[in-house]
Amino acid sequence: MTTLPYNIRPNLVGDYPEIDQSALIDPSAQIIGHVKIAKDVFVGPLAVIRADQRGPDGKVAPIRIEEEVNIQDGVIIHSDAGASVTIGPKTSVTHGAIVHGPCSIGRECFLAPRTVLYKVTLEDHIWVGMGAIAKLVTLPAFTRVPAGSVIRERPEVLGLRLVTDAEREYMKEVWAANSRLRMDYLELRNKAESIRSLTAEKTAKRMG
């Protein structure tokens, strides 16, 4: 049996995280319980993804992080008992954001620093501005939530504008930058592992 790092561990029910080998998980991040992380995901320092709240059936609903998502420093992802979270492909969840399920986030969304989401559905290509709060709503595709706003009701959603071409380009740039970081850190880790392996081999030969 493979021994997992302490920062990647089961919940009280015994659900272990499932993490694709291509994902990059910072050693200071915490991945706990029924978490499914797909290929090419980046999870930055001090992020917490924790699926451990049992529902009425005694089971823990999953937190799913789909392909090429980047979860940045200090992000917290959790959910109510029996509730799941899904974050769609190529979405950026930036510094200090909180996603509390039940939540469903579509593909290529952008959550700016310190945003808070609770019991929401975000369709694709949505921009949530810095420090904004969204609760108990569904946001249509290409919606832009202004920084610092609080969105809790349907009329507030209807008053939001669509993202501009410039904002969509910025969203792509943020995603691309973090995708490069994942590849660079993986390359650095692989080099370090090769050096350790070579050093251990030389030491064994000398002692043998």
Q: What is the predicted role of each segment?
A:
Residues E67:
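A cytosolic small-molecule/anion-sensing beta-strand core signal
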Residues N70:
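Glycine/small-residue-rich phosphate/adenosyl-binding loop
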Residues H34-D40, L139:
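Short, T/G/N/S-enriched strand-turn elements that build extracellular solenoid repeat scaffolds
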Residues T2-E18, L46, R50-D52, P56-P62, ...:
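Glycine-rich hexapeptide-repeat left-handed beta-helix
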